[in-house]
Amino acid sequence: MKLPIYLDYAATTPVDPRVAEKMMQCMTMDGIFGNPASRSHRYGWQAEEAVDIARNQVADLINADPREIVFTSGATESDNLAIKGVAHFYQKKGKHIITSKTEHKAVLDTCRQLEREGFEVTYLAPEANGLIPLATIESAMREDTVLVSIMHVNNEIGVIHDINAIGELCRSKKIIFHVDAAQSAGKLPLDVQETKVDLLSISAHKMYGPKGIGALYVRRKPRIRLEAAMHGGGHERGMRSGTLATHQIVGMGEAAAIAKADMEADNARIAGLRDRLWNGVKGIEETYINGDVEQRYCGSLNVSFNFVEGESLMMALKDLAVSSGSACTSASLEPSYVLRALGLNDEMAHSSIRFSIGRFTTEEEIDHAIETINKSIDSLRDMSPLWEMFKDGVDLEQVQWAHH
């Protein structure tokens, strides 16, 4: 068993060896190394064909037309292109956007930028279970609302939003609907023929593909128009100029094909491991799951261990690669803004750990994790004066702390 045990699949996934193998064939002189836009010789034609195959594989994953797939550098760029692209193209129709407080920073900071440009953004607060009720979204809609952006699966707590219902609502009001599917594409079934989503962001490195490549699904019927953010050779039907990175695109295509084929089996195994982990730690006193228990992705488990400081717990769990929030914000010691939005106080938000399980996690690793967590919590609480007070029946909410 390799230490530390990797339980941070929501931050990134290792590249599947089958994907790496395919990518290796697209780099050197004896492989498919040409520029897909070179139309005058075989090197270009071969690269173009490889990109076409990958585009079809990504489209297949979400049941889209391959012409609706725009390759980007990742879900962050896809989110930026979708939100800014719609806002700028349709601004004469209206300048109001709806999103949620628990979105990824790639959506929140893009919306903040649009606010600086004169757009108005409504940030919806979730219920305590992390979900946003349909009625909340509907009541925020106005005549000048041009876009709703709600993620499919939350990166920190794993809750699943009902994008089918939100899509129906948006379509009935003629409002464009963008979904950040970075955490769900390749893990949950997605069908853009059934779901009325207009724009959908996908990341390759969350589904065992390479980093630095993603895609944006842009609906053709009814047609969604975007203002490009990257200008140049007019690649990707003018929406995203720049020479296509054949090896990364081929990697993403292969990852999508494997994800589609193995999704059911992968999820059944991962759900079993997640349950095994939760059953092994839920007996610890004052331990709580964050986010809805039913409507959640099976690979995600966000747990608060009360009366334990998150950072010291992370250090005690040095054999486990886990995080206390998302990788994109774990550089800051602020408590998770997602957990704060659910109504958790600073202490509970600080004592939470995100475990995310994936394709290469084993039972042996989960059992080792359970043992490590139980030992660590016990020893950290033994050192905690707050735990002692709590066990003595002191109501910590009522304590007046002296400020020095």
UniProtKB/Swiss-Prot annotation:
Modification N6-(pyridoxal phosphate)lysine, positions:
206
Pfam families (UniProt xref)? Aminotran_5
Entry-linked Gene3D superfamilies: Aspartate Aminotransferase, domain 1, Type I PLP-dependent aspartate aminotransferase-like (Major domain)
Where is pyridoxal 5'-phosphate annotated to bind? 75-76, 155, 183, 203-205, 243
Which terms does the UniProt entry file under GO BP? [2Fe-2S] cluster assembly
A GO term, aspect molecular function: pyridoxal phosphate binding
What is the top-level taxon of the source organism?
Bacteria
Query: Which GO cellular component terms are attached?
Result: L-cysteine desulfurase complex
Q: What is its main location?
A: cytoplasm
| Record's subunit section | Homodimer. Forms a heterotetramer with IscU, interacts with other sulfur acceptors.
Quote the protein name from its UniProt record: Cysteine desulfurase IscS
